[in-house]
Amino acid sequence: MKSPTPSRPQKMALIPACIFLCFAALSVQAEETSVTPQPPDILLGPLFNDVQNAKLFPDQKTFADAVPNSDPLMILADYRMQQNQSGFDLRHFVNVNFTLPKEGEKYVPPEGQSLREHIDGLWPVLTRSTENTEKWDSLLPLPEPYVVPGGRFREVYYWDSYFTMLGLAESGHWDKVADMVANFAHEIDTYGHIPNGNRSYYLSRSQPPFFALMVELLAQHEGDAALKQYLPQMQKEYAYWMDGVENLQAGQQEKRVVKLQDGTLLNRYWDDRDTPRPESWVEDIATAKSNPNRPATEIYRDLRSAAASGWDFSSRWMDNPQQLNTLRTTSIVPVDLNSLMFKMEKILARASKAAGDNAMANQYETLANARQKGIEKYLWNDQQGWYADYDLKSHKVRNQLTAAALFPLYVNAAAKDRASKMATATKTHLLQPGGLNTTSVKSGQQWDAPNGWAPLQWVATEGLQNYGQKEVAMDISWHFLTNVQHTYDREKKLVEKYDVSATGTGGGGGEYPLQDGFGWTNGVTLKMLDLICPKEQPCDNVPATRPLSESTTQPLKQKEAEPTP
């Protein structure tokens, strides 16, 4: 879907023409011949809609994950014959014709475990294996075992997995890291990209592209051999994100690619479908109905694209933070996504060089340099003094500060003077007693205040350290770890997100109850434990007092959340 072509730009960015040919060639490579599995809303048609609208299950994901016991076409035919008969019981029909997902056994950790021991004991509990799946299962098979987040998330998730893998590496489970990289490479080879998760209903979108960083992580253990082995899959994933770029005119967008008026190429989040999400069917229909001034398909696409961002949902995507139906994800150019694309280009350059292809390495370096200039030009708010998203409708950088602003520092794409300003903005506006706030807006959405998420804590910590801003980086780690430890001491679990306005409380908001487990929290906690404790005195719990070897700061008072961006 291309936007209307505006007036021609005065000056186009100069990028070698051979690179566009490279995109086209890689796009052809990424096209797969395998039949794409159909999601349950397509397989089951009106039956799926009726079951979800009947709200037979508290969680809409339950029926999306149910496995038909026979050919869905036969089940649908039976349903059409029986549904209008007197005494028809929809719940009984579902129970007869589907195998519902089993609730995972409640994990009861042994008494007296330290935080580190608890996490190390969870890795086998969270490991799954699905080499083979039922014919009509929404679960997609993967060749190697993998670690799931936990709770209702019974499948592997793309960007979650990177932070989980950091913890696996910290625990010495390099075999599991290698298995998960192999699985994601398999998905790229099979579907042309890494889906949101290994479910058929996730195939229409991806998530924040961390695959190249996963390969880079594996290369810490296996050397350049890992970079060379997975170079073809990294190239295919890059082609997926840049699909359609060779035909774009200035001022147009195509799927995940945006070409601005001066020819700058950036990316956005996008889902190929514009229908309600099967796993949140009723909620999406209600959101679309609540705003009759917008086409429902437009709202569905933006809801799905927000899910692709990993930030589902946040005031970041919304015109009115209190109204989800005002989100417009596809008209926003995200600072975190483009930072990850920059990092992907840099790793592709490194891998190409390792493979002996210096010409291709130079092309990826050219792309990375062009994107870095685009980030500095379009994704920096000079008036506010922080990185932010770019608005395709207003043609301006947005004003809202979010934790995504730390991504340019995380991938070493930021100018040094801007990194210093980001440290100040982070400490002033986002740092709380229990860690880093996602935004400073209280919207009731889970990717807003007062919630803090493990991956964003790690991105901020690493990013600030990259630019010598160690004091703020250590503040973030210490405050978040204290929160994790206090919650663990009380509840004996690690959770998906935390309330950072204080310590010892799990986060709230969103479409489902708080989940425990939890893959990425486990991974980030292990990394941070090793960061704050001296190497000669590693710690298994968060120390009662902050280690003296690091800078100390005064306790933070809770900052007031802002009502609007």
Curated annotation (Swiss-Prot):
Catalysed reactions, semicolon-separated: alpha,alpha-trehalose + H2O = alpha-D-glucose + beta-D-glucose
Arranged from A to Z, the UniProt key words for this protein are: Glycosidase, Hydrolase, Periplasm, Signal
| A GO term for molecular function | alpha,alpha-trehalase activity
Q: What is its main location?
A: periplasm
Claim: Signal is one of the keywords in the record: yes
Keyword set includes Signal = yes
> Catalytic center at which residues?
D312, E496
Positions with a binding annotation for substrate: R152, W159, D160, N196, R205, S206, Q207, R277, P278, E279, G310, E511
Which GO BP annotation is one of this protein's? cellular hyperosmotic response
Name the Gene3D superfamilies for this protein. 1.50.10.10
Spell out the GO cellular component terms annotated for this protein, sorted alphabetically and separated by semicolons.
periplasmic space
Show the SUPFAM superfamilies listed in the entry. Answer: Six-hairpin glycosidases
EC nos: 3.2.1.28
Cite the InterPro entries for this sequence.
6-hairpin_glycosidase_sf, 6hp_glycosidase-like_sf, Glyco_hydro_37, Glyco_hydro_37_CS, Trehalase_periplasmic
Which EC class, in a word? hydrolase
- What Pfam families does UniProt report for this protein, alphabetically? Trehalase
Q: Where is this region: Disordered?
A: 539-565
Tell me the leader sequence span. 1-30
Q: How does it assemble?
A: Monomer.
Name the family: Belongs to the glycosyl hydrolase 37 family.
Note the HAMAP family from the entry: Peripl_trehalase
Q: What is this protein called?
A: Periplasmic trehalase
Source species of the chain: Escherichia coli O7:K1 (strain IAI39 / ExPEC)
